């Protein structure tokens, strides 16, 4: 399904194009990346959690600075549709807390 929109990895031209902007394949060794909080869910059927784990691990391994690279795994959750309001509020609170902490914003 994705090949129609993005191209097929079996076509060399498509493959080279995909790799050129792949978030995973464009992580540079030793670059000073900003603080990152990657969100995934254990039952996501659109973005397989393994992709988020691999991206986070690669970013951690190649990080040249000291900023944290973290992954947050939502339990019993999917891609977002039908998520309870309580869970949405908690996720937003976590994201804002991480962002404010990393920016040094006091309260």
Where are these regions (language model features)?
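Active-site-proximal cap/loop segments of hydrolase catalytic domains
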Residues: 1-107
